[in-house]
Every structure is written in C-alpha cells, then in structure tokens.
C-alpha cells in the first residue's frame, strides 16, 4: 500500500495540530483517520511518506482540546506492532488562545475552558453518578445524534447540546430513564429533559466542569467539541458527516 496524499482544509492553529510518528511503512491517510477520528472533528491529515525514511503525519483537529485528548489517548498506542509516537510539534503550541470557529476577539480561552461551538438544542440530564464525566455523557447521548457540547456538574446534573433539533427531541423521547454507565463502571438511571426556564441549568455558568479532572486516567478520552458521526467505506480522508457511536 502507498501513503496517502495531503488533504487540506483551511489553515488552523498550532494548538490543534499533532505529530504522529513511528508509523508502519504501508500506512494510509484513511488508516490514520481510523486511529484518531473518535477524538473529534479532523480538519486535515498530512501524511509524509518519503523514500528512505519512516512515514510520519500531522493531524489537525478543529478544537485544541481534541488534539490534547488525542495525544494523551494515542501516544504509545500499539498499531500493528508499531508503538505510535504522538505529541505536539516541536515548533510549539500557542499559549491559551481565544476560542475558534465562532468568531474572533474576546477573552482568551483557558486550557480547559468551554468550547466555542454551542447550540440552542439543549437538554438537561439529572441523576448522573459521581464518577460520570462529560465524555461519558457525550458518549451516551450520541445514540440520539450529533453532540456539539456536553458538560457535567458536581450535583449530578449535566447539559448536552445537539447540532439538530430533531436529535434533541429524539434524546428526550428515547434516552430519558435509561441506564447510564460511567468510565469507572458506576451506573444510574438518568432523566433527560429539554432545557428551559424551570430546569436546573437554565442561565447557569458552564465553567464548573468536572470534565478534565478525571479524564486522564482514561485512554479513550473524549472531547466536548462537535464530532460528526462516522461512516466507513471511503479510501481517502474527508470530514465525516455521519458517525456511529463507539466505546472502543
């Protein structure tokens, strides 16, 4: 097999770009996508497969936190007998930059600050177990559709925002009073309601997230940013607009 070409999207920021080394010689762009797609929306995969040298790649995500999750989750990952080296490029990351994807300006976003992409298609979830993280919640709610934001609070409640209104409606109808399992194995039956003036989260700050404090013990950390559903079949990399739920 031969290496894939360069499939470029709009220029991004260095915080979103990661280096992937120690790749097998027959690696393809699609193979790299298969390794990293679950961490978030991928903007660009640049595979370098030069004669006389081992291949390496740069993967650029839409959101810097997705890139960070990918580094934590895939550095040292065994891929067909090759232990991947995944890190931020040596040229350096930016030091906390403003949010992207939703306009410029404003205060710089902290390392674990809220994402820039938000939606009004919001549900409130209650009854979460103490170890439930926003990644767990996002995984659970993806059964209903494309999730663009998820967060949890210390009181066992959380919010989830969907890209489409019909997915929000489906979540309330199908996921209310369903069994939720955290990454630590705790289970609970959760309630799912449309957000509104009477809900616990209405008008509440999203800054009290437990999202990162527990996530580093998980090899498959998830991001709060939008991750489109994925369908397999294309031999080349392209941004996905449909994706099945995965807990692998």
Swiss-Prot record:
Modification after translation: Phosphorylated by CLK1, CLK2, CLK3 and CLK4. Phosphorylated by SRPK1 at multiple serines in its RS domain via a directional (C-terminal to N-terminal) and a dual-track mechanism incorporating both processive phosphorylation (in which the kinase stays attached to the substrate after each round of phosphorylation) and distributive phosphorylation steps (in which the kinase and substrate dissociate after each phosphorylation event).
InterPro entries: Nucleotide-bd_a/b_plait_sf, RBD_domain_sf, RRM_dom, RRT5_SRSF_SR, SRSF1_RRM1, SRSF1_RRM2
Modified residues annotated as Omega-N-methylarginine in this record: 93, 97, 109, 111
PROSITE patterns cross-referenced by the UniProt entry: RRM (PS50102)
Organism lineage string: Eukaryota, Metazoa, Chordata, Craniata, Vertebrata
Modified residues (Asymmetric dimethylarginine): 93, 97, 109
Subcellular localization, as worded in the UniProt entry: Cytoplasm; Nucleus speckle
Outcome recorded upon mutating residue 93 to A: Predominantly localizes to cytoplasm and fails to modulate splicing of endogenous pre-mRNAs
Coiled-coil ranges (or none): none
All residue ranges annotated as the RRM domain in the record: 16-91, 121-195
Sequence positions bearing N-acetylserine: 2
Listed name of the protein: Serine/arginine-rich splicing factor 1
N6-acetyllysine, modified sites: 38, 179
Chief place where the protein resides: cytoplasm
Family (UniProt): Belongs to the splicing factor SR family.
Keyword vocabulary terms for this entry: Acetylation, Cytoplasm, Disease variant, Intellectual disability, Isopeptide bond, Methylation, mRNA processing, mRNA splicing, mRNA transport, Nucleus, Phosphoprotein, Repeat, RNA-binding, Spliceosome, Transport, Ubl conjugation
Free-text domain note: The RRM 2 domain plays an important role in governing both the binding mode and the phosphorylation mechanism of the RS domain by SRPK1. RS domain and RRM 2 are uniquely positioned to initiate a highly directional (C-terminus to N-terminus) phosphorylation reaction in which the RS domain slides through an extended electronegative channel separating the docking groove of SRPK1 and the active site. RRM 2 binds toward the periphery of the active site and guides the directional phosphorylation mechanism. Both the RS domain and an RRM domain are required for nucleocytoplasmic shuttling.
CDD domains assigned to the protein according to its UniProt record, in alphabetical order: RRM1_SRSF1, RRM2_SRSF1
Span list, region Interaction with SAFB1: 198-247
Result of altering residue 89 to S: In a breast cancer sample; somatic mutation
């Amino acid at each position: 097999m031969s290496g894939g070409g360069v499939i470029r999207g709009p220029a991004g920021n260095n915080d979103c770009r990661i280096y992937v080394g120690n790749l097998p010689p027959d690696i393809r762009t699609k193979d790299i996508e298969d390794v990293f797609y679950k961490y978030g929306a991928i903007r660009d995969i640049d595979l370098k497969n030069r004669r006389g040298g081992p291949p390496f790649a740069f993967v650029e995500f839409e959101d810097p936190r997705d890139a960070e999750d990918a580094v934590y989750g895939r550095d040292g990952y065994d891929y067909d007998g090759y232990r991947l080296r995944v890190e931020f490029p040596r040229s350096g990351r930016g030091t906390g930059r403003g949010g992207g994807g939703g306009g410029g300006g404003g205060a710089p976003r902290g390392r674990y600050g809220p994402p820039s992409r938000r939606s009004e298609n919001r549900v409130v979830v209650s009854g979460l177990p103490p170890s439930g993280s926003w990644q767990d919640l996002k995984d659970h709610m993806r059964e209903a559709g494309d999730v663009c934001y998820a967060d949890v609070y210390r009181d066992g409640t959380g919010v989830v925002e969907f890209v489409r209104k019909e997915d929000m409606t489906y979540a309330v109808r199908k996921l209310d009073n369903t069994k939720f399992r955290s990454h630590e194995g705790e289970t609970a039956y959760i309630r799912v309601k449309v957000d509104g003036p009477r809900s616990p989260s209405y008008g509440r700050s999203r800054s009290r997230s437990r999202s990162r404090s527990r996530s580093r013990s998980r090899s498959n950390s998830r991001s709060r940013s939008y991750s489109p559903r994925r369908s397999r079949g294309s031999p080349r990399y392209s941004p996905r607009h449909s994706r099945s739920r995965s807990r692998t």
